């Protein structure tokens, strides 16, 4: 009894000093309230993440080689948040955002907040101010590699600045994490990859900005271009693979493949075909695709066109895929083990 009284007194003192809700019993948080998520714009990736999308109030890292689809994926998440009436911001440290392409992906560029900062410190201060406002739903930083510390910009070209970038990221994330959680802002950091020198065994690839982002990120996704999509001789898009390499909210290491079409973004009908085959909803016999004994096309591109022309069939397939989400997720884990064996 005395211990309980002492604990109650301590809790009351903490709440007086730091405000109500600063400490509580874990079970009292409305039955561990459901995670609020924002769709990635890819049905397959939403399923691979295990929670239906990207979680609000968390840090996300998307990394990969050049032209792999990092910015495209981030812009799809922005478009999905805007569809729900959310406010989004884009910190364009690379000074390379194309508003015409963003509009084609469904982004409302007229209401998208954009900043093109001069230094890494300025970019992260802007990000911190926006997050603390509590009015931003999605914040994208493109990219970590372009967050150049002020000292490096003001120095000479050959000067050595060992660890400066990593220290900047570490300090910023220590400062940002608490306000990101409180404001329920989804913060997406895009990152590039580099090769570590002298690595004889294991993967020589690493991301820029030190290790801080790896620790603070709740989800890390590795995005790669694995092939080209051609219409006769013309390349019209990329085949893309995304692997969830870290996930604090669901089992990690699931992967999904989808098409990114030039000028269109993620091909939703292509995903419906692939996921439909995995779930047994769409049957594939040779080059023919069929659904409920109805042939929908010979060859993947013809089947995709059929789904574009028949949105009711596409909606029916999507509904059934969502109803069999567990089956599709299990297939993603199987695909992962098969890919590793092939590698």
Swiss-Prot record:
Cellular component GO terms, alphabetical: cytosol
Keyword DNA damage in record: yes
One example of a Gene Ontology biological process annotation: DNA repair
UniProt keyword terms in alphabetical order: ATP-binding, Cytoplasm, DNA damage, DNA recombination, DNA repair, DNA-binding, Nucleotide-binding, SOS response
Predominant location category: cytoplasm
S-S bonds: none
Pfam families to which the protein is assigned, alphabetical: RecA, RecA_C
Subcellular location: Cytoplasm
Ranges in coiled-coil conformation: none
UniProt xrefs under NCBIfam families: tigrfam_recA
Record-linked HAMAP family: RecA
Family: Belongs to the RecA family.
Function recorded in the entry: Can catalyze the hydrolysis of ATP in the presence of single-stranded DNA, the ATP-dependent uptake of single-stranded DNA by duplex DNA, and the ATP-dependent hybridization of homologous single-stranded DNAs. It interacts with LexA causing its activation and leading to its autocatalytic cleavage.
This protein's name: Protein RecA
